[in-house]
Amino acid sequence: MAKRSKVGKFFTPKTVISGIVILIAIAAAIGANVIVPYDPNEVDPRSCFLPAFSKGHILGTDKLGRDLLSRLIMGAKSSMLNAFLIVAFEVVIGVPIGLICGYYGGKIDAVIMRIWDVVCSIPSLLLSFILIAIFGRGNFTGVMSIGIAFIPLTAKMARSLIITEKKAVYVEAFKSMGYLDMKIIFFHILPNVITTMIAQFTMDIGAAIVAMATLSYLGLGIQPPDADWGTLLENGMQNFYNNYVLLAAPAIIIMLVTVAVNIFSDCIQEYIDPSQRKLPTFKQYEKRLIHIRRRQKAAI
């Protein structure tokens, strides 16, 4: 039996399934304005609380007669875009700070890391609440507050990676050749450690979706009539007894997408670092042993 290629080992069933879920969410976000069957903010008093599978409304309508499917698709645009913006913000700010602090070390590194330790001791959502209380509620403030809350962990991760990598022989060689420190950090060290960071950044997308949905659920994120999955969840909670799908649909979507993102990030981590792969169970060992014995008998 031929061994699978390195790329083939990555495309396991769980990788493919989780990847499909993520691609569907991204496709819905990108094409939201085109594929929505109705205007998500169009009010129709004659169609309030229509149940699922009603004529023209697959998932029914809310208390204002707005099509739930259209609002979920448009909510995907807001939720996915916000999640990617949050991760982009933490990467652009956190990674350079962590790399520079780890490369140079010294008192500045010690002071900045102690500040990050204090910030990390505050739960991300609590820190977001504090920032929103200072700067006001809204989608932009929500994205920035969560992004700021995520920066310390990203910076600490980048710092820990470069502390190990800067001792490599190639770094010493570049130093002896007179290369600028910034060029060594961002053009030579960063490409060698970025693969380790990718799995964490992928997982942060799922965390960002949940965090932003939480803020919107509490009325601190995106404001009506615009919708994301958090506002739809809050609206469904208020009107659960009139149409349970209003609550179930956004809850299931948030769960599916975040679980898919986490599984996909685990797959990336296992692919990058084979030592992270789970050990086979006893039954799997037994099946392999039986397979080997059968091949040996066939060969005889």
Regions found by a protein language model. Give the residues of each.
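N-terminal signal-anchor/first transmembrane alpha helix
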Residues: 1-38, 115, 193, 298
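Transmembrane alpha-helix signature in integral membrane proteins
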Residues: 68-103, 257
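Generic hydrophobic transmembrane alpha-helix motif, especially the helices
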Residues: 58, 62, 68, 93-94, ...
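Transmembrane alpha-helices
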Residues: 77-93, 128, 182-214
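Short helix-to-coil transition segments within interhelical loops
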Residues: 61-66, 103-104, 173-183, 187-192, ...
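Hydrophobic alpha-helical transmembrane segments of membrane transport/permease proteins
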Residues: 12, 28-63, 220-226
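C-terminal transmembrane helix and the adjacent membrane-cytosol boundary/short C-terminal tail
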Residues: 195, 202-203, 244-300
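Glycine-rich helix-loop "coupling/hinge" segments at transmembrane-helix boundaries
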Residues: 132-134, 161-162, 203, 211-253
